[in-house]
């Protein structure tokens, strides 16, 4: 990572960047929404396309000099369409939240009714939370998970849809560890005359590799981020049919955004090409293997997992039987250099700033090359940190496990 020029201009920023690199190298990253991009993605992200304004779309720009921007955006669009089997792709959204907002703008009027997953049950802020624009401008009602199984109750979803008659149904989640039945969601949407949007931000990499069912054949709109399991830059994509292509494009620009970030779109294109390689499928398979191994090992140590395990890259740990909160667990694990996020569990008695659980994901550790055997060690370190109270010897043992794993699976050696 060549920061010589930056160091001459702004040594404070260089110190922070180098500190962050050291943190990433020496900590176990278990936040489910984080990952480590490739060197190729990182280089594309920092290219000269950051200088180019390109309002509009390829062939229909509002600025001159966009011939190479058009090449880059067309490559990204065509790769997204090919990877997921979509008829149309918009690669301009700056984030998953922007992508979701654009879909709402395209098909809803303020006050229209929509049905989404309850944030407290694993949904996302942009699926109608009252603190989000989505909840302020649209009339969202909610479905959730069954109290006993921790899984989506599709019969309850259908019942709510019949009662509420939403214009749009939103499927997808930010903290749901099980396969989502998109075909069932489409049946429900068709029954009540609703459109279906799927937010696959967390599982897009698994979908691209054929490990999780693809929502594209079932949904009118599919949104995703390009980071998380996709291992690309931070950004968003919308996939849709030809029927809604124009509406979506107008909703993104000029609806919710101005000029696209062309350097980010270049990095998206690189990540999409990487996702087409055979090794990407093997990588995604290892993510799921690692998640299941970590889940099983944690349950072996007496941790309770929402829904009893995982089908994808993430798991929700219910800490109530350990007599600690999610916030306390996050802080304790940080002290042994394991990074997680506190997370509400379904029917959580704690407030969102405290929570009764933590969310764990295996995408970033898998990017470092860690395998199932390493996950057993990760589970051991988590148990040492959380199951024995303030025991400094146990915490030091956990730190030793973390340090050894970080040495055995180094990160970004090429950046030295």
From Swiss-Prot:
Pathway assigned in UniProt: One-carbon metabolism; tetrahydrofolate interconversion; Amino-acid biosynthesis; glycine biosynthesis; glycine from L-serine: step 1/1
Binding positions ((6S)-5,6,7,8-tetrahydrofolate): 119, 123-125
Reactions catalysed according to its record: (6R)-5,10-methylene-5,6,7,8-tetrahydrofolate + glycine + H2O = (6S)-5,6,7,8-tetrahydrofolate + L-serine
UniProt subunit comment: Homodimer.
Alphabetical list of CDD domains matching this protein: SHMT
Main location: cytoplasm
Subcellular location: Cytoplasm
Positions marked as site (Plays an important role in substrate specificity): 227
Entry keywords, A to Z: Amino-acid biosynthesis, Cytoplasm, One-carbon metabolism, Pyridoxal phosphate, Transferase
Protein name per Swiss-Prot or TrEMBL: Serine hydroxymethyltransferase
Record-stated family: Belongs to the SHMT family.
GO annotation, biological process: glycine biosynthetic process from serine; tetrahydrofolate interconversion
GO molecular function: glycine hydroxymethyltransferase activity; pyridoxal phosphate binding
Organism: Moorella thermoacetica (strain ATCC 39073 / JCM 9320)
Record PANTHER family: SERINE HYDROXYMETHYLTRANSFERASE, SERINE HYDROXYMETHYLTRANSFERASE 1
């Amino acid at each position: 990572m060549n920061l010589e020029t930056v160091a001459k201009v702004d040594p404070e920023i260089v110190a922070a960047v180098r500190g962050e690199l050291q943190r990433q190298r020496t900590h176990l990253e278990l936040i489910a929404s984080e990952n480590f991009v490739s060197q190729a993605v990182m280089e594309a992200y920092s290219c000269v396309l950051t200088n180019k304004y390109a309002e509009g779309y390829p062939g229909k720009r509002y600025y001159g000099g966009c011939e190479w921007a058009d090449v880059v955006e067309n490559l990204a669009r065509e790769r997204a369409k090919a990877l997921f089997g979509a008829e149309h792709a918009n690669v301009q959204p700056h984030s998953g939240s922007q992508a979701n907002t654009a879909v709402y703008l395209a098909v809803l009027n303020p006050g229209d009714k929509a049905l989404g997953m309850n944030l407290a049950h694993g949904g996302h802020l942009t699926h109608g939370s009252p603190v989000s624009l989505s909840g302020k401008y649209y009339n969202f009602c909610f479905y959730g998970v069954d109290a006993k199984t921790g899984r989506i109750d599709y019969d309850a979803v259908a019942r709510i849809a019949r009662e509420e008659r939403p214009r749009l149904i939103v499927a997808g989640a930010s903290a749901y560890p099980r396969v989502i039945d998109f075909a069932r969601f489409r049946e429900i949407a068709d029954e009540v005359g609703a459109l279906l949007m799927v937010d696959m931000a967390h599982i897009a990499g698994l979908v691209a590799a054929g490990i999780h069912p693809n929502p594209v054949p079932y949904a009118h709109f599919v949104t995703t981020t390009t980071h998380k399991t996709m291992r690309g830059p931070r950004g968003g994509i919308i996939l849709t049919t030809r029927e809604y292509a124009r509406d979506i494009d107008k909703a993104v620009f000029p609806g919710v955004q101005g000029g696209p970030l062309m350097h980010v779109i270049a990095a998206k294109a690189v990540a999409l090409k990487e996702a087409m390689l055979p090794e990407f499928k093997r990588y995604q398979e290892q993510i799921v293997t690692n998640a299941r191994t970590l889940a099983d090992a944690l349950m072996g140590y007496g941790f309770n997992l929402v829904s009893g395990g995982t089908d994808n890259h993430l798991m929700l740990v219910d800490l109530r039987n350990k007599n600690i909160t999610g916030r306390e667990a996050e802080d304790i694990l940080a002290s042994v250099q394991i990074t997680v996020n506190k997370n509400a569990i379904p029917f959580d008695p704690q407030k969102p700033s405290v929570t009764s659980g933590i969310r764990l994901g295996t995408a970033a550790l898998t990017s470092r090359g860690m395998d199932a055997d390493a996950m057993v060690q990760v589970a051991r370190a988590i148990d040492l940190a959380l199951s024995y109270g303030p025991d400094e010897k146990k915490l030091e043992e956990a730190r030793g496990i973390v340090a050894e794993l970080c040495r055995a699976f180094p990160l970004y050696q090429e950046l030295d």
